[in-house]
């Protein structure tokens, strides 16, 4: 599976509208005294999210990490991480695989221009 992810932010006056596909992320910072607080403006579309995992599995995809696919670690779906924590989750994220294929698993559940899925 392949493709790309994207995000766009549209500013009009004091309003912002954000749209995203995949794991592209938008954040905004707010200065509070000497600190800057980051707020997420988008929600990643990845297999870390149970709703996205179930959606792609219902469409016939397989969701597992590379190590799970290769039998190095046992299969599990315990991907319960909060936004941002997945970056520190050991470097082997859950991926979406085409049924019966061992290539190329992608770490996002929605994309633009997925040639393998179109094929």
Segments (PLM) and residue ranges:
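PP2C/PPM-type serine/threonine phosphatase catalytic core
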Residues: 1-119
């Amino acid at each position: 599976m392949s493709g790309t992810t994207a995000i766009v932010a549209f500013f009009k006056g004091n309003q912002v509208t954000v749209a995203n596909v995949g794991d592209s992320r938008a954040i905004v910072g707010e200065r509070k005294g000497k600190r800057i607080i980051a707020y997420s403006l988008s929600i990643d579309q990845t297999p870390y999210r149970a709703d996205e995992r179930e959606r792609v599995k219902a469409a016939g995809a397989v969701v597992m990490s590379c190590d799970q696919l290769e039998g190095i670690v046992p299969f599990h779906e315990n991907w319960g991480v909060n936004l941002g924590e997945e970056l520190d989750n050991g470097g082997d994220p859950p991926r979406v695989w085409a049924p019966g294929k061992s290539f190329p698993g992608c770490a996002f559940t929605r994309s633009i221009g997925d040639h393998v899925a179109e094929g």
